[in-house]
Amino acid sequence: MPPQPKWKKEEEEEDSTRFTMGYWQMRGLGAPIRMLLHWGKQNAEKTKPFAFKDVQYTQDGDGVNKWFKEDKVKMIEESNPLANIPYLIDHEEKKTIVHFLATCDYLGQKFGLDEKEVDSEQRERNAQIAMEVYDLRNNVIRLVYKFPNSVRTQEEFDKQLPEHLNACKKTYQKLESWLGFYDFTYFAKKDEVSSCDFHAFEMIDQHEHYQTLLAGDEKRDVLSEFPRLKKFHQAMRNRPELKTYFESKEYTDFQLNNHTLANSWDGPGPSSMK
């Protein structure tokens, strides 16, 4: 048997909290996981079903340096050698799950959103949509963060945003066709939510905001061209299980993505507060 991680209590947090989720203080990849946790709390037995540890994306004692030099090192030694953000601590099961897709899959099964049989059709559909939506997320990363051959200034961001929105229509069309092919409201089950739906919602929701940043004549309503996607987006927004999430600061106040730290350049950093 391989060596097992040493599990140490952290201020007795697991005695009252079922899940602790850690991520940067933004929506990004954290938003779908936060949504899942809000969804799951309806059947929670714990007094405090979840807690968030939001890491500030600043190079100071409470931000990036603390995560990489202290918290991540501790996690590697005590609970998961793959330590990364986002992470999820399941205090009841004494597990630390890392990486976005793995965390969504874990919570999807914990909350009964996804079927447990690996070869089930729901699991197959869920996995395919999860990867398709992640491709769209990767395209967003190239738009909002400073990478070679990507945006470096506010002017470049303003120029590339319309091009990005036009390009994302290809993904929207594939997702629209998928919903039409199966005649589903949601992506992996006809009338019931699966874990892939949370990231799909977040990416559509982010793009709804990006459209508001366009100049006058360039403003558009991309989602109106895809009625099934629009219905899906509205159906998720109206779910009573997510009401507390949509009222939370994590949804209303957090930036969609972080400002980059590269070369002290803040970048456009689209924010839900703009």
Predicted regions and their residues:
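C-terminal helix/juxtamembrane-tail motif
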Residues: L242-T244, E250-K274
